[in-house]
Amino acid sequence: MPKLKTRKAAAKRFKVTGTGKFMRRRAFRNHLLDHKSTKLKRHLATKAVVDERDADNVSLMLPYS
């Protein structure tokens, strides 16, 4: 059986934690930041955990993670 291919777009967007969960970047921190508060921008700079309902799809895209 051939090796499974990794979806490169997903590999750039998600990282796996030691417990097997996936970390992702938060949205809304790309542009149009003038009217957003410093507190909000600081919060958006942190990583978030991928929801458990989406984790199965992410793991299919990253077979060797």
UniProtKB/Swiss-Prot annotation:
Lineage start: Bacteria, Bacillati, Cyanobacteriota, Cyanophyceae, Synechococcales
Entry keyword Ribonucleoprotein: yes
Biological source species: Prochlorococcus marinus (strain MIT 9211)
Domain of life (superkingdom): Bacteria
GO process annotations (BP): translation
Keywords: Ribonucleoprotein, Ribosomal protein
Cellular compartments per GO CC: cytosolic large ribosomal subunit
UniProt name for this protein: Large ribosomal subunit protein bL35
MF-aspect GO terms: structural constituent of ribosome
NCBIfam families: rpmI_bact (TIGR00001)
